[in-house]
Protein backbone atom coordinates (compact mmCIF):
# COMPACT_ATOMS: atom_id res chain seq x y z
CA UNK A 1 0.00 0.00 0.00
CA UNK A 2 1.29 3.47 -0.89
CA UNK A 3 1.94 5.95 1.92
CA UNK A 4 -0.97 8.42 2.17
CA UNK A 5 -3.33 6.08 0.32
CA UNK A 6 -6.57 4.96 1.89
CA UNK A 7 -7.33 1.32 2.66
CA UNK A 8 -10.91 1.48 1.39
CA UNK A 9 -10.12 3.33 -1.86
CA UNK A 10 -6.43 3.63 -2.67
CA UNK A 11 -7.21 5.78 -5.75
CA UNK A 12 -9.21 8.43 -3.80
CA UNK A 13 -7.97 12.01 -3.79
CA UNK A 14 -7.44 13.96 -0.60
CA UNK A 15 -10.41 15.87 0.77
CA UNK A 16 -10.57 19.52 -0.24
CA UNK A 17 -12.81 21.74 1.90
CA UNK A 18 -15.79 23.31 0.14
CA UNK A 19 -14.51 26.79 0.90
CA UNK A 20 -11.39 26.09 -1.19
CA UNK A 21 -13.22 24.50 -4.13
CA UNK A 22 -13.94 26.69 -7.14
CA UNK A 23 -16.31 25.86 -9.99
CA UNK A 24 -15.27 27.36 -13.34
CA UNK A 25 -17.89 25.54 -15.38
CA UNK A 26 -15.33 23.88 -17.66
CA UNK A 27 -13.65 20.50 -17.35
CA UNK A 28 -14.96 17.15 -16.26
CA UNK A 29 -15.61 17.75 -12.61
CA UNK A 30 -15.81 21.54 -12.77
CA UNK A 31 -13.60 22.06 -9.74
CA UNK A 32 -10.25 23.74 -9.46
CA UNK A 33 -8.71 23.45 -6.02
CA UNK A 34 -7.09 26.12 -3.91
CA UNK A 35 -7.80 28.95 -6.34
CA UNK A 36 -8.66 32.42 -5.09
CA UNK A 37 -12.01 33.76 -6.16
CA UNK A 38 -12.37 37.46 -6.86
CA UNK A 39 -14.34 39.33 -4.19
CA UNK A 40 -16.56 42.28 -4.85
CA UNK A 41 -17.33 44.73 -2.07
CA UNK A 42 -20.24 47.10 -2.27
CA UNK A 43 -20.50 49.85 0.27
CA UNK A 44 -22.58 52.96 0.69
CA UNK A 45 -20.97 56.26 1.40
CA UNK A 46 -20.61 56.80 5.13
CA UNK A 47 -22.45 60.09 5.15
CA UNK A 48 -25.68 58.70 3.74
CA UNK A 49 -25.67 55.63 6.02
CA UNK A 50 -24.98 57.78 9.07
CA UNK A 51 -27.79 60.11 8.09
CA UNK A 52 -30.17 57.18 7.54
CA UNK A 53 -29.28 55.73 10.95
CA UNK A 54 -29.77 59.10 12.63
CA UNK A 55 -33.15 59.52 10.90
CA UNK A 56 -34.31 56.08 12.05
CA UNK A 57 -33.09 56.76 15.59
CA UNK A 58 -34.86 60.13 15.65
CA UNK A 59 -38.09 58.56 14.35
CA UNK A 60 -37.92 55.90 17.08
CA UNK A 61 -37.29 58.58 19.70
CA UNK A 62 -40.26 60.62 18.47
CA UNK A 63 -42.49 57.53 18.49
CA UNK A 64 -41.35 56.65 22.00
CA UNK A 65 -42.08 60.18 23.21
CA UNK A 66 -45.55 60.06 21.63
CA UNK A 67 -46.30 56.77 23.38
CA UNK A 68 -45.09 58.14 26.72
CA UNK A 69 -47.21 61.28 26.31
CA UNK A 70 -50.30 59.22 25.42
CA UNK A 71 -49.86 56.98 28.46
CA UNK A 72 -49.32 59.97 30.75
CA UNK A 73 -52.53 61.53 29.41
CA UNK A 74 -54.40 58.27 30.02
CA UNK A 75 -53.00 58.02 33.56
CA UNK A 76 -54.27 61.51 34.37
CA UNK A 77 -57.66 60.88 32.74
CA UNK A 78 -58.18 57.44 34.31
CA UNK A 79 -56.51 57.93 37.68
CA UNK A 80 -58.22 54.90 39.23
CA UNK A 81 -56.36 52.47 36.97
CA UNK A 82 -52.77 51.30 37.24
CA UNK A 83 -50.12 52.26 34.71
CA UNK A 84 -49.67 48.61 33.78
CA UNK A 85 -53.37 48.21 32.98
CA UNK A 86 -53.46 51.39 30.92
CA UNK A 87 -50.30 50.40 29.05
CA UNK A 88 -51.72 46.95 28.30
CA UNK A 89 -54.96 48.42 26.92
CA UNK A 90 -53.00 51.00 24.89
CA UNK A 91 -50.75 48.34 23.36
CA UNK A 92 -53.71 46.00 22.74
CA UNK A 93 -55.27 48.79 20.67
CA UNK A 94 -52.07 49.14 18.64
CA UNK A 95 -51.22 52.56 20.07
CA UNK A 96 -54.56 54.05 19.03
CA UNK A 97 -55.33 56.68 21.67
CA UNK A 98 -58.98 57.15 20.70
CA UNK A 99 -59.74 53.41 20.80
CA UNK A 100 -57.98 53.14 24.16
CA UNK A 101 -60.04 55.98 25.64
CA UNK A 102 -63.25 54.35 24.35
CA UNK A 103 -62.28 50.98 25.82
CA UNK A 104 -61.34 52.46 29.20
CA UNK A 105 -64.62 54.43 29.30
CA UNK A 106 -66.55 51.21 28.73
CA UNK A 107 -64.50 49.52 31.44
CA UNK A 108 -65.43 52.27 33.91
CA UNK A 109 -69.13 52.06 32.99
CA UNK A 110 -69.28 48.27 33.34
CA UNK A 111 -67.31 48.25 36.58
CA UNK A 112 -69.74 50.68 38.26
CA UNK A 113 -72.72 48.62 37.05
CA UNK A 114 -71.26 45.42 38.48
CA UNK A 115 -70.59 47.08 41.85
CA UNK A 116 -74.31 47.86 42.18
CA UNK A 117 -75.14 44.13 42.10
CA UNK A 118 -72.71 43.15 44.85
CA UNK A 119 -73.96 42.58 48.42
CA UNK A 120 -72.68 44.80 51.22
CA UNK A 121 -70.81 41.95 52.92
CA UNK A 122 -69.87 38.45 51.92
CA UNK A 123 -69.85 35.65 54.48
CA UNK A 124 -69.26 31.93 54.20
CA UNK A 125 -72.48 31.37 56.14
CA UNK A 126 -74.54 33.24 53.55
CA UNK A 127 -76.95 30.94 51.75
CA UNK A 128 -78.05 31.62 48.23
CA UNK A 129 -81.74 32.51 48.03
CA UNK A 130 -82.22 31.07 44.56
CA UNK A 131 -82.44 27.53 43.23
CA UNK A 132 -83.25 24.14 44.74
CA UNK A 133 -80.23 24.17 47.07
CA UNK A 134 -82.19 26.36 49.54
CA UNK A 135 -85.06 23.92 49.86
CA UNK A 136 -82.63 21.01 50.35
CA UNK A 137 -80.72 22.81 53.08
CA UNK A 138 -83.92 23.68 54.99
CA UNK A 139 -85.14 20.07 54.71
CA UNK A 140 -81.81 18.79 56.05
CA UNK A 141 -81.92 21.27 58.92
CA UNK A 142 -85.49 20.26 59.81
CA UNK A 143 -84.74 16.53 59.70
CA UNK A 144 -81.62 16.81 61.85
CA UNK A 145 -83.35 18.91 64.48
CA UNK A 146 -86.25 16.45 64.85
CA UNK A 147 -83.94 13.40 65.15
CA UNK A 148 -81.84 14.74 68.04
CA UNK A 149 -83.59 14.02 71.36
CA UNK A 150 -83.61 16.59 74.15
CA UNK A 151 -82.51 14.11 76.80
CA UNK A 152 -80.38 15.37 79.71
CA UNK A 153 -76.78 14.21 79.69
CA UNK A 154 -75.56 12.64 82.93
CA UNK A 155 -71.97 12.80 84.01
From Swiss-Prot:
Alphabetical list of InterPro entries matching this protein: CID5/6/7_CUE, CID5/CID6, CUE
Domain CUE: start-end pairs: 66-109
Motif PAM2-like, residue numbers: 7-17
Region (Disordered): 114-155
Biased composition (Polar residues): 130-148
Tissue expression pattern: Specifically expressed in immature siliques.
One GO molecular-function entry: ubiquitin binding
Residue ranges of the TM segments: none
Domain of life, source organism: Eukaryota
Note: Overexpression of CID5/IPD1 leads to increased ploidy levels and longer hypocotyls in dark-grown seedlings compared to wild-type.
Domain characteristics, as noted in the entry: Contains a PAM2-like motif, which seems to be involved in the binding to the PABC/CTC domain of PAB proteins.
Function summary: Promotes polyploidy in dark-grown seedlings. Regulates the endocycle leading to hypocotyl elongation.
Protein name: Polyadenylate-binding protein-interacting protein 5
Organism: Arabidopsis thaliana (Mouse-ear cress)
